[in-house]
């Protein structure tokens, strides 16, 4: 009877040790590779309207005169070019609608989940993120959202520029969240956004101050009550529609 050739115990132990070392370094290696993919961003150039990886905001004509917290926003590529959903089936590229940005907030790319495959998620959502649509890079997320919104109808109350930015942030799973919507995007920018300069502040609030003053002088205090009611109704609509009737809001 011939004996089968066995594998020496020393070789088995050595192979297990090698496998353990491979497993122990594989995850950090992936993370380091992902961080290496995030090349340095160019500097923000307000004069040329280049805001790398920023959310940008500008006041809307007439609407912002009555409710200055409402404005038009866009999201910028890594090279600083602004993309914004400005009308039905239309995404502006490097031509921000309604004037130059007045406020901006630069986002941190390291807070994005950019999985190379199903097993590469750094967020808690995994399959849900994949099903919604993931991105390998920041610009890839913007390109995917652009293709999606090129087939959507613009509506200031249900599907607007904030919806486009929220869609991009959900593809990026920014901050570990896929719950971005037009309300929390607006609040994020309102709380953490930076004014570009003093003239941006004036441009954003002076028309509202003038309209309010003229209204009080010509109509009286009822105008102020009506203006406050208008702002409150707008705010209530976006809150209720976003969190209570999710099928209405894009």
Swiss-Prot record:
Keywords for this protein: Endoplasmic reticulum, Golgi apparatus, Membrane, Transmembrane, Transmembrane helix
Transmembrane domains' residue ranges: 55-75, 200-220, 221-241
Location of this chain's protein in the cell: Endoplasmic reticulum membrane; Golgi apparatus membrane
A Pfam family matched in the record: RTE1
Biological process (GO), any one: negative regulation of ethylene-activated signaling pathway
Induction summary: By ethylene.
Membrane disposition: Multi-pass membrane protein
Domain of life assignment: Eukaryota
Free-text tissue specificity from the UniProt record: Strongly expressed in 1-4-day-old seedlings in the apical hook, cotyledons, root vascular tissue, root tip and root hairs, with little or no expression in the hypocotyl. In light-grown seedlings, expression could also be seen in the apex and young leaves, and disappeared from the cotyledons by 10 days. In mature plants, expressed in floral buds, the style of mature flowers, stems and the rachis.
Coiled coil spans: none
Chief site of localization: endoplasmic reticulum
GO cellular component, one term: endoplasmic reticulum membrane
Family matches, as InterPro entries: TMEM222/RTE1
KO phenotype (gene knockout): Enhanced ethylene sensitivity.
Role noted for this protein: Acts at an early step in the ethylene signaling pathway. Positively regulates ETR1, leading to the negative regulation of ethylene responses.
Subunit and partners: Interacts with ETR1 through a region corresponding to its ethylene-binding domain.
Name assigned to this protein: Protein REVERSION-TO-ETHYLENE SENSITIVITY1
Organism of provenance: Arabidopsis thaliana
